[in-house]
């Protein structure tokens, strides 16, 4: 009986997956805390305010789901949707919306992407990366031109750079 139990235990040990094998079917990811996402959004909004622009800012997670959405008092009503869609686009494609705007011009191989719902081919959306990982994206709408929107979004990322580098 003792020999049978010992053999059964040995067989179970050999049949059980190793810890490294069990992890092959999953992965771990980190997310911005609501506080960190809010810090980025506020920094982007403040950067645009200092430049004299009334804007909306969206921060989304890696799946493109909104974490923070801010609109300055006099930013146009449309800026909320535009910022949210820019952030979704940057997170979804893991690249800046300015890059996508250039790559999806008429006649380019990727021009069909412009027909996707929520796809926003205008500068101002940036991917939030830290420690080799994508956390999501931040986007701004309402400044005069995508370049100005992008500068404000970059200020938002800069404000949280220390918190997301590890």
Regions found by a protein language model. Give the residues of each.
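Cysteine-centered motifs
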Residues: 7, 13-14
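N-terminal signal peptide c-region/cleavage motif recognized by signal peptidases
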Residues: 15-19
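Bacterial N-terminal signal peptides that target proteins for export
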Residues: 1-8
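Flexible, solvent-exposed loop/hinge segments and secondary-structure transition points
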Residues: 21-166
């Amino acid at each position: 009986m003792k020999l049978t139990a010992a053999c059964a235990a040995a067989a179970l040990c050999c049949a059980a997956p190793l810890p490294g094998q069990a992890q092959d079917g999953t992965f771990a990811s980190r997310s911005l805390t609501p506080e960190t996402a809010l810090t980025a959004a506020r920094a982007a909004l403040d950067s645009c305010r200092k430049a004299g622009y009334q804007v909306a800012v969206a921060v989304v997670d890696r799946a493109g789901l909104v974490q923070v959405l801010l609109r300055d008092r006099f930013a146009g009503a449309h800026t909320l949707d535009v910022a949210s869609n820019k952030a979704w686009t940057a997170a979804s494609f893991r690249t800046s919306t300015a890059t996508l705007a250039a790559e999806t011009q008429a006649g380019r191989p990727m021009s069909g992407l412009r027909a996707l719902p929520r796809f926003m081919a205008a500068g101002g959306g940036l991917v939030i990366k830290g420690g080799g990982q994508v956390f999501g994206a931040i986007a701004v709408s309402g400044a005069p031109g995508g370049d100005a929107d992008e500068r404000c979004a970059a200020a938002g990322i800069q404000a949280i750079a220390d918190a997301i580098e590890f």
